[in-house]
Amino acid sequence: MTQLHFDNRLRQQLPGYQEEGARRREVRAAWSAVMPTPVAAPYLIAHSAEMAHVLGLDASEVASAAFAQVFGGNALYPGMQPWAVNYGGHQFGHWAGQLGDGRAISLGEAIGIDGGRYELQLKGAGPTPYSRGADGRAVLRSSIREFLCSESMHHLGVPTTRALSLVGTGDAVVRDMFYDGRPQREPGAIVCRVAPSFIRFGNFELPSARGDNALLRQWVDFTIARDFPELVGTAEALYADWFAQVCQRTAVMVAHWMRVGFVHGVMNTDNMSILGLTIDYGPYGWVDDYDPDWTPNTTDAQGRRYRFGTQPQVAYWNLGRLAQAVAPLFADQAPLQQGLNRFRDTYLACDRRDTAAKLGLAECRDEDLELIDALRALMRDAEMDMTLTFRGLIDLSPVHPDPAQLHDAFYDDHKRVASASQLQEWLQRYAARLQQDALSPDERRALMRLANPRYVLRNYLAQQAIDQAEQGDPSGVQELLEVMRRPYDDQSGRAAFAARRPEWARDRAGCSMLSCSS
């Protein structure tokens, strides 16, 4: 039997409801005890060997029937004390009231072999007191997407929650994928998500909205003590340092999203991690042909609130809602504005750093921001693939820049021909800038390879793996996981995983637009 060590500080140190199973319309506590609902026949589809190692789980344990039972929701390891957390949130700009973990159940806080804290959370393990009448289950397609994206983002260097395992349940789940009145039975699955903390902005918003300043203060004090132990001080000064840290981490996270072309799709405040981690992988996507107005979320198709280009502004707005929530703990609101300013300053610094790295420059001058903006405008107008364009610049000659280097980045031959002179003009500007730069050609290429991935988890790649898995073949999931472990390396025999989106996937469900149905 695996001997994981759990201390479960959240459950021990914050007020909650101990009795299991009851569904409540309104919960005035931080958490509620709840047991996963057993499934028919749990079986392991895929797992992260790296995450298992950090937790101290060896290969034989992961391959055991007991592992599938535990992470399929049918059993517990000693020390696990399952709970679901209570929170609220702003959804699409409007206060939604109490939400909570509707289908996420935390098993416990494990201490890894590295001394780190790892909360293990099952998504899709059945109803909780916060399910609001839903079944608390998840389908295979959404579970595959969450599992793969969690690990892919980690290896891209983007702050993120992780995934330990993907377990099939042997049960069917009924879902209306596009909310069009045509529900279908789909295979069920459960992902075990892993993070130092799953605390969200909404954990602070809910007690604040209810005027429960005592619980609000408990949440803040607990979060600082457990998750920000490096912060020292007392009273408002400590709270101000903490809020500024949250703002800074959020800025770093979003800057990475913009660097790799990731679109979260549903940046509600209940989907914002207090640690600045990417959390809740639902209708996400990667930008294929560059379009700052693109969103993968069908629910957001009309308003496009969460489109790619507005993600930094949305993050700032969300931090403003967090500032409002914790304002009762401050006599003076100035420290909160200073924290919001930290977000702005950090994001701008990250943007300059990433601009230099993506273009292979020793430093980012003001005119370099204009240079990359001109490239983005060209990519948008000429329908060029973001990932392939930046990757294609790596081997460009600063002496004789050849537009053919970017041939594969175009989705439309007519637009490629029409934009040829603009592209040549931009390449000449870029080549001239490279000749002024202090980096050697080898240094430039090395820098660019670490900033511009060769492989990203394009929606069509994930959908192909889903199609296979739904037919009983998990090999596509496992191969994608392996490819995405080294996203910056040129991998022999895997050129197909770096190809631009094929035409058949342009408008196919799951490849272009996705819903929140999962």
Swiss-Prot record:
Transmembrane segments: none annotated. It holds the Pfam family SelO. One of its GO terms (molecular function) is AMPylase activity. The active site is at residue 270. Mg(2+) binds at residues 271, 280. ATP binds at residues 100, 102-103, 123, 135-136, 193, 200, 280. This is Protein nucleotidyltransferase YdiU. The gene is ydiU.
